[in-house]
């Protein structure tokens, strides 16, 4: 299967939204609420520390006063449908 990472940049009222989606099947419901906790990982400790999403969310919220969220969703690229997780970064536009 071809691995896809799909980027979308959208304007939503006074906000810019960056969506980063993949086709890796999504995040299981039983861990979705935990992925932003520090040191949470589903990988072996030698492959990750579990602080990437925690730090990403803190940067978006504290430095940019924005939000970082995720959802499992279907998306389409060049008439092909894919399913995976989508991370959305939402930041207020500054004029």
Residue ranges and their predicted role:
Residues 2-18:
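Short beta-strand-loop-beta element adjacent to the nucleotide/active-site pocket used for signaling
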Residues 22:
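Acidic ATP/Mg2+-coordinating residue in the GHKL
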Residues 27-39:
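Short conserved segment of the HATPase_c
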Residues 39-49, 64:
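Glycine-rich ATP-lid/hinge loop adjacent to the conserved G-boxes
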Residues 52, 56-57:
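Short alpha-helical Gxxx[C/S/T] motif in the catalytic ATP-binding
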Residues 60-61:
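Detector for a conserved hydrophobic position within an alpha-helical segment of the HATPase_c
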Residues 64-78:
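Glycine-rich ATP-binding loops of the HATPase_c
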Residues 78-94:
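Short C-terminal beta-strand
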